[in-house]
Amino acid sequence: MSSTHPLKDQLALLIEAALEALAPDAPVSLEIERPKNPTHGDFSSNAAMQLARPLKRNPRELAQLIVTELPASTLVAKADIAGAGFINFHLTPAAWHGIVRQVRTAGAQFGRAQRETPQRVLIEFVSANPTGPLHVGHGRQAALGDALCNLYAAQGWDVYREFYYNDAGVQIATLAASVQARARGLQPGDATWPEAAYNGDYIADIARDFLAGKTVKSDDREFTASGDVDDLDSIRQFAVAYLRHEQDLDLRAFAVHFDNYYLESSLYTDGRVDATVQRLVAAGKTYEQDGALWLRTTEYGDDKDRVMKKSDGTYTYFVPDVAYHIAKWERGFARAINIQGTDHHGTIARVRAGLQAASVGIPEGYPDYLLHTMVRVMRGGEEVKISKRAGSYVTLRDLIEWTSKDAVRFFLLSRKADTEYVFDIDLALARNNDNPVYYVQYAHARICRVFEEWSGDVATLADADLAPLEAAHELALMQRLAEYPETVASAARDLAPHLLVHYLQMLAGDFHAWYNAEKFLVADEATKRARLALADATRIVIVNGLALLGVDAPEKM
């Protein structure tokens, strides 16, 4: 057995040594868990119950034999048998003291895993159309994506962050028409205002700068407006560059960066879309019907075959999606994760079907998807739906300006991605323990204040005697610290950053309870140094955890 819990691994070695003495060839997959009832010990193993049948022994008797054969150790204070044959382990205080030392020795590396050969993973997120400001749904996606990138990097993966720009669809033409109408002096509501046009104030801003012949620079392009209201192509290019720049500013304010911006339009100019269609035709996975080209996606689990090329000669949107994911695979990303809204659920089966039909070696189930629901924003007990800037929705920039980057990130990560989230602006602004991000950050600030009052050298705590750490609050805190590496691993594996959010809230709760129950800077030097060492270990884990979420750990609040 190999886990990410330091004490579980040590216990596993003891159990394996006992089993080697009793039944060296017996097959067993060790499972060590934390009992729900703390009176049942710190950890529990069902090893005896697993081996009872192959060894033809009574599980309780076998459990007793395993306990008898356990090597002497400073780790286990007592082991007893419960139920049908569970072995419950009660650890020594020294075992938990070791966690404090591990945390303080590892520092920023505590909770991070190393891989001999890091695997590459591409995580695609946000991927908003360059047709308007980022909304709060994009914000949730940005928070999820950035946190997952950090979590995977912490697990030793070589992480590549990518933003896919849908810059080749009908919506871009609508954007250009909207800006052109504004440039001609039209306004939403006018009789000649284009149908389905974008109405937000940002359209007027783009039109004004276009007429002024301004130059705008986005991540990978710079474009100067012609200023000619009849030059629709110039309007289109300027509007896309303008909004890409605006989205870059939003993401920068949210502390999110990308390694690459992949343009949908490049799939056409590079010939990837045509090549993908030709590959599928050559594989015999297509047919023509009613003047359209169809892909046999039902052969790969889809509920019906899908049109690839319409009778007017244009491609449906899922064709460039297939081409894009083939490009991901060919760039060497054996693992790909897409973070999208739940409204994209229907695309999963057809994209995966297209990838399988292409027969390029892509495994089934590629790519992975993390789907999230939208976000409702509340203020003063009422839902906020309209933003003057966007015209019809609350933007990510609105939310950051109304609250803070840290509050937005922490709140949007605090629930499972597919659970609807209500963002309470009043709660995000509260400076009390009801505000979860304040609660966690305040724990860190409290620790910093203790060390400021102490004014000693933290490095001298390396050899502190931790024997005085024996109170219930101290034990609970040390137990929580030990869970951190396992929490990080689970959050990455399950695509579930909310697990880390919940962990940090519990860790902060354990610390606040200890802080309220005990004084740290006491007269007894040994007790003071031990408590300071535990406080420092707690500080390290809070900082590490918040960093993975992209949230700051202020020293003063």
From Swiss-Prot:
A GO CC annotation given for this chain: cytoplasm
Molecular function as annotated in GO: arginine-tRNA ligase activity; ATP binding
Top EC class of this enzyme: ligase
Enzyme Commission number: 6.1.1.19
Protein keywords: Aminoacyl-tRNA synthetase, ATP-binding, Cytoplasm, Ligase, Nucleotide-binding, Protein biosynthesis
Protein name: Arginine--tRNA ligase
Family stated for the protein in its record: Belongs to the class-I aminoacyl-tRNA synthetase family.
Motif placement: 'HIGH' region: 128-138
Quaternary structure and interacting proteins, as annotated: Monomer.
Biological process, per Gene Ontology: arginyl-tRNA aminoacylation
Species this protein is from: Thiobacillus denitrificans (strain ATCC 25259 / T1)
PROSITE patterns attached to this UniProt entry: AA_TRNA_LIGASE_I
Gene expressing this chain: argS
Matches recorded under SUPFAM superfamilies: Anticodon-binding domain of a subclass of class I aminoacyl-tRNA synthetases (SSF47323), Arginyl-tRNA synthetase (ArgRS), N-terminal 'additional' domain (SSF55190), Nucleotidylyl transferase (SSF52374)
InterPro entries according to UniProt: aa-tRNA-synth_I_CS, Arg-tRNA-ligase, Arg-tRNA-synth_N, Arg-tRNA-synth_N_sf, ArgRS_core, DALR_anticod-bd, Rossmann-like_a/b/a_fold, tRNAsynth_Ia_anticodon-bd
Compartments, as annotated in UniProt: Cytoplasm
Matches recorded under Pfam families: Arg_tRNA_synt_N (PF03485), DALR_1 (PF05746), tRNA-synt_1d (PF00750)
Catalytic activity: tRNA(Arg) + L-arginine + ATP = L-arginyl-tRNA(Arg) + AMP + diphosphate
